[in-house]
Every structure is written in structure tokens, then in C-alpha cells.
Amino acid sequence: MTVKLGFVVAEFNRDITYMMEIEAREHAGFLDAEVADTIYVPGAYDMPLAIKKLLERGEIDAVVTIGCVIEGATQHDEIVVQHAARKIIDLSLEFGKPVALGISGPGMTRMEATERIDYAKRAVESAVKMVQRLE
């Protein structure tokens, strides 16, 4: 069975999320998974609605989120990631389908974010493994 993935990709810090998306797509191909649809959103905080839209489509087996939240002068990065992660978990449970957290951050510098680009592959792997193990 080919696992059909939906990607939700944040455009904020696009220089980094673009590279994360490329890594994720390549790894999906390596795992014989298909990226059936991709929705681009402004930032990580905007992901839950796009995730819900993908999960409502019956053909999507799992969703992979791709985002990068870099530390700023305030705690904004922590708030964004905490709330996005909580809602992402809620949507996974509501729809009974895996939603892999491929959002790097909070509390990291741009350099650290660049070093963690390959974390997107881990999110793809998590999504595919969960679909296979829950069948």
C-alpha cells in the first residue's frame, strides 16, 4: 500500500522551510509514499485549519507539517509552537490519522534552524510508520 501524505508547509522563514520541504519530498519518495497534496500557509500558527482540510479528504492517510519558528526578542516563538502543536495533536486524535510534527523550534537561532533542516525527514518517516502500524 502506498501511503498518501498531505503536506502543510509554512511560508514564514521560507528559505529554511523550502529546504525542509525538498528533504521531506525526497524522503517520501525513498519510502515509497506519495505526496498527494500540499497546502502552503503563512506560518506555523496557521497550520491547524489547513491540516483539518486535508484530513477531511478521505484519500489522505497522514499529514506532515513543515515549519520553522526562530527565537525572537519575546516569547512569541514559544506561544506559536505550543498552541500549534496542541491543536495538531487534537486534530490527529479527532480524525484518527497521524499528523507528524515537522516544526523546528522554538528557542533556536537561524543557524540552528539551518542545521535542523533534515528534521523534516523525521516527520515524514513518523507519518509513514504510524500509518503502517495502525492499519
From Swiss-Prot:
Top-level EC class as recorded in UniProt: transferase
Metabolic or biological pathway, per its Swiss-Prot or TrEMBL entry: Cofactor biosynthesis; riboflavin biosynthesis; riboflavin from 2-hydroxy-3-oxobutyl phosphate and 5-amino-6-(D-ribitylamino)uracil: step 1/2
Keyword Zinc appears in the UniProt entry: no
This protein's UniProt keywords: Riboflavin biosynthesis, Transferase
GO molecular function, one term: 6,7-dimethyl-8-ribityllumazine synthase activity
Record's GO cellular component terms: riboflavin synthase complex
List of catalytic residues: 76
EC number: 2.5.1.78
Keyword Transferase assigned: yes
Positions with a binding annotation for 5-amino-6-(D-ribitylamino)uracil: 12, 44-46, 68-70, 101
Binding site for (2S)-2-hydroxy-3-oxobutyl phosphate: 73-74, 116
PANTHER family tied to this protein: 6,7-DIMETHYL-8-RIBITYLLUMAZINE SYNTHASE, 6,7-DIMETHYL-8-RIBITYLLUMAZINE SYNTHASE DMRL SYNTHASE LUMAZINE SYNTHASE
Function: Catalyzes the formation of 6,7-dimethyl-8-ribityllumazine by condensation of 5-amino-6-(D-ribitylamino)uracil with 3,4-dihydroxy-2-butanone 4-phosphate. This is the penultimate step in the biosynthesis of riboflavin.
Family: Belongs to the DMRL synthase family.
Name of the protein described by the UniProt record: 6,7-dimethyl-8-ribityllumazine synthase
Gene name tied to this protein: ribH
